[in-house]
């Protein structure tokens, strides 16, 4: 239907809004998330990094951000691209995808081979990591809780006796990060992994 008054149609208005928290109306926007993580501590069995997750609108303006820490296994760049190496992943730029998209892709391939579908355990995955698969973002406090995965935390500590890093309040920070992804990751989520 032509809109001679140069105003949005009822359909455009209806689809441009969604229910917000507590019944208020908020406008839908096409936002994306970029997570910049910098490794700052290398222990015998764990690596800690600081991160900032930033949400951007479609014009590139930052609309929100959160900070925290990630725990990964020990860093060994010689093994970072080796399957099942139980080390932190190689530095680089990766996509973060919800499990539903990864499950769909994996199960499509499995069905082609006549295999049964699988159900992934975690909510968010780091995608297309060279030589690696199943790199998730999930809760945990210790290096033994991760096999290449990213464990978010509110803060961290270093144990001099065992020469390992740990993160704390992981469930709280994971919920905050996952809510951030859900709220702002409509146009994609990227993670940039670097070191100081």
Where are these regions (language model features)?
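Cell wall/extracellular polymer interaction/catalysis modules
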Residues: 2-166, 172-187, 194-196
């Amino acid at each position: 239907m032509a809109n001679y008054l140069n105003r949005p149609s009822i359909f455009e208005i209806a689809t441009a809004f969604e229910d917000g928290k507590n019944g208020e109306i908020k406008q839908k926007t096409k936002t994306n998330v970029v997570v910049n993580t910098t490794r700052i501590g290398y222990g015998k069995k764990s690596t800690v990094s600081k991160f900032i997750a930033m949400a951007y609108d479609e014009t590139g303006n930052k609309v929100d951000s959160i900070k925290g820490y990630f725990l990964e296994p020990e860093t060994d760049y010689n093994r970072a691209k080796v399957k099942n190496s139980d080390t932190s992943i190689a530095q680089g730029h990766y996509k973060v995808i919800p499990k539903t998209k990864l499950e769909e892709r994996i199960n499509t391939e499995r069905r082609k081979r006549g295999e049964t579908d699988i159900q992934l355990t975690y909510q968010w995955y780091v995608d297309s990591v060279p030589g690696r698969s199943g790199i998730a973002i999930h809760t945990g406090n210790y290096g033994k809780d991760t096999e290449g995965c990213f464990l978010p935390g509110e803060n961290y500590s270093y144990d001099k006796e065992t020469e390992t890093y740990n993160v704390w309040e992981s469930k709280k920070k994971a919920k905050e990060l996952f809510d951030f992804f859900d709220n702002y990751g409509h146009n994609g989520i990227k993670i940039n992994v670097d070191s100081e």
